[in-house]
Amino acid sequence: MPAPGDQHSRISNPFEDVKPRVSEYTAQEIATLQTRLERQLGPEYLSARAGPSGQKVHYVAAEKVIGLANEVFGFNGWSSSIQNIQVDFVDEHPQTLKISLGLHVVVRVTLRDGTFHEDIGYGHIENCKGKAMAFEKAKKEGTTDALKRALRNFGNVLGNCVYDKAYLAKVTKLKVEPTKFDELNLHRHADFAKKDVVAEPRLPPVKPEPSNTASAAPHPPLPPLPEADSFDDLLGEFDEADFCVVDADGHPDEVVLPENSHASGSSGNTGASTTNRGPGAPSGNQSNQQRPMQPSSRMNLNGPAGRPQPQTPNHQINRSGPQNGSINNQQNNHGMRPSPHMANQGRPPPPPQNNNNTSNGTGPHQRPLGNGPQQNTPPPNNGAATAPSGAEPVAFFSARAVARVPDDASLPPPPGTATPTALFNPKAESPSIRKTPGIDHSSSRPVSRTGQHVPAKPVQDGGGLANDNPSNNAGNGVQNQPQKPQPSQQRGSILNPQFDQSRRIGAPGGAASPLSNRNQYRPPTMMKRPPLADVPNGTSNGNGTPGDSKRMKLN
């Protein structure tokens, strides 16, 4: 059991002196400190001020002394304490009420091992406006002075060397170079500090070393990938017809010739080029300089048999062959055009091509003129109208045609042929797209406000365009091709109404709009006012007529 009174032993007596914690220096640390303290300061640590009799007084500033103490002893190797502050005098002027006072301060500097030095410092002020300001200035001055005097007791490096006149006479002659300000040495806030992005060094590419396949360990199998969700959520709203895929079952009216029909149709017309040349036909040299026209894939699919064809813009024109059909379409749709040899004068002639049908200077592109009915003579495969070597006919195919190619297909189909499922049909109509009933969506025609097509204006007599091709009208008994009705020249521009100069505003057939004369100036019509009738100033004796408003009524 504890003895009586032991419970009070744990509490320190506040009236006893506190023994500081002492950490003894080793002999090596004492020798190191002694060496540092004996060294003298350089000229960069000294400062000078004007003293009595015009002399310079050298001293060490307080901030430099504190920095030297932290450098020599360490920031936790020394401490300072104020031992006493005593006011010597305080005087107040009776008239101005200004304060003058003086006081002295005793400061002790203690090291880690308990070694300390004390010294006195003095502070004063004269004619200060207030007492608080006077005491603040005097106490700070006395404390700083006492601290510097206490630190100089430790050695030369803390300011004691300043009292050596021989040392001052030599050190003041040294020139101090101005220090270069370095921004990197500043302690900056994290938000304002400049962050230099250090680029990571790129490692050189590692060359793959040849490894022995027999000794190399096999790679672990890859983890199975999760099964992908079905695309019903993504493509469920679309229909197969939206992709414009030609389906043989969905379009039974489109017929495609088999592959053997192309060969039979081209081989059976080898003697068609021996017809006589007309007076207006170009010479043989001009025909050889014509550019060969490449038949498209749609032309190759249509033979001279005249079978039904897919929907095309010019379905009313009966095509007699690849070359004849293309020439007729160009002449009927675009009017008169210059001949090929005139159009090609500005361009360099293409290299000559081998043509087997050179008799009488006629080429496969020329159309014969005769008294009998014209015959459709498609050019042979070896004529000049065929595509040059290395060029293939251009056509659009469906993306689904690749999936329908069998895996055992060894040879590709011959150029110029295509299956009905592979061709891309731009005229395919999708049943999933909403369309207004009663509107023809295959053509661009004006629509009235009632939602119906505007009927076309009747064609005037002779208003249709005549066939500009002289070869179509040269033969006897040859019927002209049916022409599409051409719109009247007085008809306004429907596609671009802003370019129509005869545009009218309002309902058709109504009165002219007053805004139609906006581009002309018309002066306002001024009607001449009739003169006033003469009215007598005198009054009558009451004999006036009762209907006269100018006379006074007596009754």
Curated annotation (Swiss-Prot):
Key words of the record: DNA damage, DNA recombination, DNA repair, DNA-binding, Nucleus, Stress response
Cellular localisation: Nucleus
The entry's DNA-binding region: 148-152
Primary location group: nucleus
Domain of life, source organism: Eukaryota
Family as reported in the entry's similarity comment: Belongs to the RAD52 family.
GO biological process, one term: DNA recombinase assembly
Organism: Pyricularia oryzae (strain 70-15 / ATCC MYA-4617 / FGSC 8958)
InterPro entries: DNA_recomb/repair_Rad52 (IPR004585), Rad52_fam (IPR041247), Rad52_Rad59_Rad22 (IPR007232), Rad52_Rad59_Rad22_sf (IPR042525)
Region (Disordered): 197-232, 251-555
GO cellular component, one term: nucleus
Segments of skewed composition (Polar residues): 283-300, 312-334, 468-478, 491-500
Composition bias, Low complexity: 260-276, 354-375, 382-404, 479-490, 536-547
Function: Involved in DNA double-strand break (DSB) repair and recombination. Promotes the annealing of complementary single-stranded DNA and by stimulation of the RAD51 recombinase.
Gene3D superfamilies from the UniProt entry: DNA repair protein Rad52/59/22 (3.30.390.80)
Gene (UniProt): RHM52
Name of protein: DNA repair and recombination protein rhm52
Expression induction: In response to MMS and UV treatment, and in response to heat shock and oxidative stress.
Pfam families per UniProt: Rad52_Rad22
GO molecular function: DNA binding
Subunit structure: Part of a complex that includes RAD51, RAD52 and RAD59.
